[in-house]
Amino acid sequence: MPEELKPTMTQNFIHDFIDEDIAQGGQFQGMTVHTRFPPEPNGYLHIGHAKAIFVDFGTAEKYGGLCNLRMDDTNPTKEDVEYVEAIQEDIHWLGYDWGGRFFFASDYFEKMYEYAVELIKKGLAYVCELTPEQFKEYRGDVNTPARSPFRDRPIEESLDLFARMRAGEFPNGAMTLRAKIDLASGNFNMRDPVLYRINHMHHHRQGDKWCIYPMYDFAHPLEDALEGITHSLCSLAFEDHRPLYDWVIANCPVPARPRQIEFARLGINYTVMSKRKLRQLVEEGRVSGWDDPRMPTLCGLRRRGYTPRAIRNFSERNGVSKAASTVEYAFLEHCLREDLNETAQRRMAVLRPVRLIITNYPEGQSETFSVENNPNRPEDGAREVTFSRELYIEAEDFLPAPVPKYKRLYPDGPECRLKGAYVIKCTGYETDAAGNVTAILAEYDPDSRGGDPADGRKVKGATIHWVDAATAVDAEVRLYDNLFTDAEPDAGDKNFLDCLNPSSLEVLPHAKVEAGLAGAEAPASFQFLRQGYFCVDNKDSAPGHLVFNRSVNLKDSFKF
């Protein structure tokens, strides 16, 4: 990753553990720190995954180590090559690279099967014929262990049945392979957990070669060990699974002994990050797709105009801890606003246009003004914008009759500045038969070029933005808001669909933007003066049909 794009890695407890491992030597003596990011290719990555990516790849970078990308494709039910490709694109977009270390868990299926056979031979696994319903009954409760009637099945019989399971002789759910561990354990994950289940389903990579698939708790430690992972960084949800992780490593003849470390997931308010719920939003047409700019998916955030640096800084500033917490969505917006304020060039765009006619400006005449592109980056220079007798301004910048504290245009009201151009004063307006304002009339001060009257008088009205009507370009502008009205839409027994925000998208099809934006292409972002930060839509925008998405407004609602 380029140095200028790297966030500053703060100290966190994972680094403390790794420092301790290195200092103590032992199995980590002289070893390169080796991590992995192992998404399941059954959906698109979201902002929560961005934190895991940051932790996995960032930790490897900190220690000069390696980080693998591994597709955890052990469940063929919803996995697809579409997601495999999207995951790679998202990680590269964030600025990380796996350096050719790209693996699929399914490529280890044969080796995993061999390890399972070894466990059976050692008397540490057996084939169980309990149905899913019976399985729950035989798990017992906290105080009462429950024993499968198949637990003492002869080793040879389990070996035979397991081979026949692989051969496809039995239907889904007929049998499982279970580890033989501790029926009295207070950790239910250790009460003879399932290692393999039957699933007659086509696999996106292995085709129909397999009809038995390893459970995550069995596959995960084996994958880590086979790849030489030193530190397996997982979400806190797997803390209770660590004893099983260690049991698998200890009882299979694997080439490495990774250490699992758990950290808290990233939670954000006003959204959901369950893949199941995100898929439901897509499949029910509640959003336009996985890349809908209101979605927390990385492709959705990218389409909305979020930058890799903003997301990395957001992930880094939230830190890494064991304590689960929910972060304000406003903080994510703050990180984007902070980045775009520094990098985005300024432009003028009128979202709800009304004509402004400067009655004392010569007809047929025009001129240009030099306007700075970004006050924070002098190296970005300036651009020329045209000015003529007819302009477009925002409809909200005019009122037929004033209201208290209104500082913009109204008949015989105070003088106002046209941004970077002239001082004007409203003299009247025109309406259609229905009484709708169709044009605003004003006069300008020819001696106020640049916005400052030659006589030094104070301009009491506001400064408003504008676009030259003669050269303006048509555009569609989409204003996005939170997808949910509830800060915790999936908390408790809430139906998250009942919390959807009916006003999360407003489309303005008749916006006018300055001529210099005619050739704008994704992923370009701009600050539209007085409006917010906008990006060119990477899906619907095209020559002759510009589409801009509001990424974030100008006002920062986040409080430190």
Description of each model-found segment:
Residues 256-335:
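Long, charged, mostly alpha-helical binding arms that flank functional sites
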Residues 69, 73-75, 118-277, 336, ...:
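Active-site cores that bind ATP or allylic diphosphates and position pyrophosphate for catalysis
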